[in-house]
């Protein structure tokens, strides 16, 4: 992920952790090869939605250059207000 995108996620992490619904996004990210099965299992092992959200964002920040655009695309389908929030930061 590019540094400018990491910066956006870092600035918006509190909103993302509070509002993100990670479960519906996991299969989407898996289908796009953004995360692998081990990542999915690890994220799903957490009991709290907020912890799952935090771990997902932290993992995405370490992924390839398409991770940010895949996050925005996934959010546009599931939680468009979060996608708008990220795009406005950029």
Short names for language-model regions:
Residues 1-15, 21-90:
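Alpha-helical death-domain superfamily interaction modules
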